[in-house]
Amino acid sequence: MEKTSNTSKPLSRSEINKIIAVATGIKEKKIKEIFKYLNTLLLNELVSRSVCILPENLGKLRITIRNARYQKDMQTGEIRHIPPKPLVRYSPSKTIKETAAKVRWKYAD
């Protein structure tokens, strides 16, 4: 890896493509196509089955439905109905959870 996690900005898509291209010897354009196809595949899987397992032990995406609810407008006192809403939830894998637990936060004591 060229960049470390101590940088202030996260890696951009083009930087990720460059790093993968150098590491694998595949052209950046081909890597871009691979990611585009992977994106389409994951979206189709998510729509058709409501669950999508991400590759390389990254975790799982799933669609859940937020229940309908009532909300009171604090200014007018009017009670509004909020309909059910589909949400995409991400469940990280065990290795990601363990790695995140080891991260030293800059605001921690």
Swiss-Prot record:
Signal peptide: none annotated. It comes from the Bacteria. Transmembrane segments: none annotated. InterPro entries: Hist_DNA-bd, IHF-like_DNA-bd_dom_sf. One of its GO terms (molecular function) is structural constituent of chromatin. This is Uncharacterized protein MG353. It comes from Mycoplasma genitalium (strain ATCC 33530 / DSM 19775 / NCTC 10195 / G37).
